[in-house]
Structure formats: C-alpha cells, structure tokens
Amino acid sequence: MAEEKHQHHHHLFHHKNKEDEGGPVDYEKEVKHHSHLEKIGELGAVAAGALALHEKHKAKKDPEHAHKHKIEEEIMAVAAVGAGGFAFHEHHQKKDAKKEKKEVEGGHHHHHHY
C-alpha cells in the first residue's frame, strides 16, 4: 500500500475568511482585528526600541560587557524594525478591510478620472 502524504501548512495566525467557509464576512470584525494587531505591532516596535536604547546605555556604563550589550542593542533594533513592519502590514490590511466594507455596504462605484 502506498502511504498517503498529508501536507499541513502551519501559520502563525490561522487567518480564515468567512467567505472560504461559505458565510458572509463580518467586515467590522475584520477592521477591528487588523486594528488590534496594528496596535500590537506598534507597541512591540516602541518596546523593542526602548530596550535597544537601554542596551546602548548599558554598553557605555559597563565597558567590561560592552560587546554583549552592543549585540543585544542590535538584536532589539532589528526586533523594533520587524515589529514596525508588522504594524505597517496590518495598517494596510485594515485599510483594505475598510475599503471592502465600504464597497459591500455602500455599493459605491469608484470612477477614476485621469
């Protein structure tokens, strides 16, 4: 017998659209969800940035372990940039959800004038 292989894709956020399940999409819930994740990203960026500055300060005050603190500073700086990127991504997801909500509820047609 041949073994059946099942491929499972694991994602950090198991984000499913209601449309994929056959139900209507709650756009207000989508907007709130992305807004919440955007705020989490912003907070992560601020926290990681503060920790990077703290490690920079520790590197100056503790010359014996300065190299360790500089490495930790750089790690936190990268984390801050990553969190900022995540917040930026969620901001655009939120904008898209708002746009879809407006199109579905209002039935507005966009006319482009060039």
From Swiss-Prot:
Biased composition (Basic and acidic residues): 97-107
Origin species: Solanum lycopersicum
Protein's name according to its UniProt entry: Abscisic stress-ripening protein 2
Gene name for this UniProt entry: ASR2
Bias-annotated ranges (Basic residues): 7-16
Database matches in InterPro entries: ABA_WDS
Family: Belongs to the abscisic acid and water stress-induced protein family.
Location of the region described as Disordered in the Swiss-Prot/TrEMBL record: 1-25, 88-114
